[in-house]
Amino acid sequence: GEEIGGTVHKAPAAEAGYVASLHAAVDVLYEQGPALYLLLGGDGLASYVASRLVQTGAARPRILGIAGGTANVGPIIALTMDELESLTLDKISFVCCDALEARNGARFLALGFNDLVLGNTLLSTINGQALTIDALRLAREGVKAPAVPLGGISKDLRVIKNGMEVTGGLASPAQAVLSTLQQDDTYGRAVMGALCMAAGDRHTAALTLLDAPVVSFESRPEGKTAFMTASQLLFRSGDELSLRGLFPEVCLAADGNPFPLENGSLSVRLVEDAVMVYERR
């Protein structure tokens, strides 16, 4: 019963044809009232489809995602083709899955089911090779161009939670990542820092600010032969989180789908039980 988005997001010109066709196909399927949606693709396709279903008004649509993309990390993409072939209807069960709603000012951008990443790059595949590519060029021109992550996404990042600025985090992070913690077992895992404090709370998400990019195929010393620094902040259903002061070249990657930002800002909130996904046993 929760309103998502308000107005349907219009994709940048370069992707408008693809996204419009995808939305039209989803709308046709939705009108048929299927018991579940079978999806073959990657996390980006899954995010586009699930977001459209929720925006259209589908109440907790059941989505069975089959891996066919670059990363296939889920939670919607839950099975391989081989696993699907051995699956029987009596063994299919679903579980509710939270999402993160991303807005740029009053403009709805996307729902993220795995993560929302702020940077200038995203992960993709070119001629069968997994590469780090320029997010803005893909969004605006439809071009997959190899790129190197920025050294920083802001000179003085401001994080606001429920109208109050939260200080003490990295002011010039290389990347910012937001994700729900519903699918993760953080109980007793003190090594995870603040994330272990979310154990037992079903509808919790986290913001992590990093001094080196982790969403990248580039090999880096941070975390291996050099320290990586992270600032973590938890938020839950009902909270409103905003990030301000982002550089113009910073783009939102919602489950790998690029969305340019205006005025260097992003607002995020957690949406409880947005869809239902295949439950692994």
Segments (PLM) and residue ranges:
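ATP/pyrophosphate-binding catalytic subdomain of soluble kinases
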Residues: 94-221
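Structural motif
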Residues: 35-36, 62, 273
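Generic beta-sheet signal
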Residues: 64-68, 87, 119
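Short, acidic/small-residue loops that bind anionic groups at enzyme active sites
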Residues: 49-80
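ATP/nucleoside-binding phosphotransfer catalytic cores, i.e., glycine-rich phosphate-binding loops
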Residues: 192-281
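N-terminal glycine-rich "phosphate-gripper" loop used for MgATP/nucleotide binding
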Residues: 38-44
